[in-house]
Amino acid sequence: MEGQWGRWRLAAAAAASSSGDQIAAAWAVVRARAVAPVLQFAVWACMAMSVMLVLEVAYMSLVSLVAVKLLRRVPERRYKWEPITTGSGGVGGGDGEDEEAATGGREAAAFPMVLVQIPMYNEKEVYKLSIGAACALTWPPDRIIIQVLDDSTDPAIKDLVELECKDWARKEINIKYEIRDNRKGYKAGALKKGMEHIYTQQCDFVAIFDADFQPESDFLLKTIPFLVHNPKIGLVQTRWEFVNYDVCLMTRIQKMSLDYHFKVEQESGSSMHSFFGFNGTAGVWRVSAINEAGGWKDRTTVEDMDLAVRASLKGWQFLYVGDIRVKSELPSTFKAYRHQQHRWTCGAANLFRKMATEIAKNKGVSVWKKLHLLYSFFFVRRVVAPILTFLFYCVVIPLSVMVPEVSIPVWGMVYIPTAITIMNAIRNPGSIHLMPFWILFENVMAMHRMRAALTGLLETMNVNQWVVTEKVGDHVKDKLEVPLLEPLKPTDCVERIYIPELMVAFYLLVCASYDLVLGAKHYYLYIYLQAFAFIALGFGFAGTSTPCS
């Protein structure tokens, strides 16, 4: 009996082994004939996009370094800049008597009329900061109008903002509190409505600050002269400075990315093309440039970039001044940052879809400028970059460990990303120690950016979804005598779990484990690290948050 049972076990084992061999053989055939060709095509597509991206990054880095560091092509050398001088010889922006001239002397008429717009939406944490900073700007009081555009839906917050405006009005500040019956067009709608008031028709320039931005008192004295003395300049953009960058690791990484954006992208665009995307705040527009471009439009969630592209097609030049910095707040919660990045990426891709034909057919600009707009500004930076990062580093490379027939060139997998990282590190020398975290975090965020870019390109139903970036007021909440916020309630643990991140993490863990046990490509160390990054963010271990209930 035992001998018969032994023969049955051997037969079953042989059958199982035979079945396993058949399955393995079948998978090998399918893999070689169907999976491998598709994956190899994806590899070469990613290689092509990688070359596009590294050349673009190298070009921008070289231009920004040579133009600013070596040739010293600073704004004051490229364009005429002189302090605004009154008829009697007084100079706006100086000390003593000169400062008196700038703040309302007899020669105030020498100063152009300036409108300062502050759009806000339920900004209970930071509204006092922006309003106070705007009201403290050094400029003749009869030559400036502060316009608070309050789209708040919370009646209590609206009352607080209106009360703050009345307090400044009692101090003889020319401040207007404006509200709308609806939020049509969101920020673009508010800015457009603000420009429709009769009193704005006397204004030559308009400075725009989001609710968490705090310009220095001499902001207008430094920026307006560029516009006054250079009639072809339609926009002066200044640099953002972050007051809460040290709150957590996520804000430090954000600072790295945005510092690179300003030092490289904006600087190179300003130096070589007199064009870049308006950042939506901390900038001064010539009103005639806005009007000639067709005003604010709400067709996308990047109304600032939309206006900039249209104004550029009309021949207006833009100037970025990196020496002028405006304090602002970074989103310190992962949820807020995800929403912000989705809005920026989706809106830019959607604007590309809407304006590509218009740019190509425009007869008022050169072929070189059309190429720069369509290829560099939109296609490579707003489409290729987000799609490539996630597709190649989080999908194709991990999957390739299971398909030995697929080969990935070392130059595309190692040399190009290393070159991009080095170029980023050169412009962020103080943050080199954060580079590994920056790489892993950006790869996770690339999942959301790719989805947002595809949403914008395909124009799905959520393409114009607008979620205002949450302001926490990290840098002021400990200094307030009376807290601006009620005590935060504990967060439901479920709300801190992000399923998409965890699904990608599971996929990466499977690929890494396969490579460790059965594979021969030895990518598992990188894949494991990237999987742990997805796990950390998937469970909400990024940014600031309240304890779980």
Swiss-Prot record:
Key words of the record: Cell wall biogenesis/degradation, Glycosyltransferase, Golgi apparatus, Membrane, Transferase, Transmembrane, Transmembrane helix
Subcellular location: Golgi apparatus membrane
GO cellular component: Golgi apparatus; Golgi membrane
Binding site for substrate: D210, D212
Transmembrane regions listed in the UniProt entry: 35-55, 383-403, 406-426, 497-517, 523-543
Membrane topology classification: Multi-pass membrane protein
Top-level taxon: Eukaryota
Gene Ontology terms describing biological process: cell wall organization
Keyword RNA-binding tagged: no
The reaction(s) this protein catalyses: GDP-mannose + (glucomannan)n = GDP + (glucomannan)n+1
GO molecular function annotation: glucomannan 4-beta-mannosyltransferase activity; mannan synthase activity
Residues at the catalytic site: D151, D304
InterPro entries for this protein: Glyco_trans_2-like, Nucleotide-diphossugar_trans
Entry's EC annotation: 2.4.1.32
Function (record text): Probable mannan synthase which consists of a 4-beta-mannosyltransferase activity on mannan using GDP-mannose. The beta-1,4-mannan product is the backbone for galactomannan synthesis by galactomannan galactosyltransferase. Galactomannan is a noncellulosic polysaccharides of plant cell wall.
UniProt record similarity statement: Belongs to the glycosyltransferase 2 family. Plant cellulose synthase-like A subfamily.
Name of the featured protein: Probable glucomannan 4-beta-mannosyltransferase 4
Annotated organism of origin: Oryza sativa subsp. japonica (Rice)
